[in-house]
């Protein structure tokens, strides 16, 4: 399963762990993803999305209807 946010499209990034001795080893920075259910009043049903914490703030700001309309316009929902 891909670790991708359904709303923002955030994906894992790559970087380095850096020790005190400045040794570098590769690592992945994973997005803070959570499965959340959102009640869509216009459709009278629950919608389950895998969203990042940034996407939760975006949904709080714009509303779930606007976010779903944007997802459908992109062909992702």
Curated annotation (Swiss-Prot):
InterPro entries: Ribosomal_bL28, Ribosomal_bL28/bL31-like_sf, Ribosomal_bL28_bact-type, Ribosomal_bL28_sf. One of its GO terms (biological process) is translation. GO terms for molecular function: structural constituent of ribosome. Gene3D superfamilies: Ribosomal protein L28/L24. One of its GO terms (cellular component) is cytosolic large ribosomal subunit. Keywords: Ribonucleoprotein, Ribosomal protein. Belongs to the bacterial ribosomal protein bL28 family. This is Large ribosomal subunit protein bL28. The lineage of its organism: Bacteria, Pseudomonadati, Pseudomonadota, Betaproteobacteria, Burkholderiales.
């Amino acid at each position: 399963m891909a670790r991708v946010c359904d709303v923002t499209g955030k994906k894992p990034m790559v970087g380095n762990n850096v020790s005190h001795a400045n040794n570098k080893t590769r690592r992945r920075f994973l997005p803070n993803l959570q499965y959340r259910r959102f009640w869509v009043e216009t459709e009278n049903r629950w919608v389950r999305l895998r969203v990042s914490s940034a996407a939760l703030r975006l949904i709080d700001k714009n509303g779930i209807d606007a976010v779903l309309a944007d997802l459908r316009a992109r062909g992702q929902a």
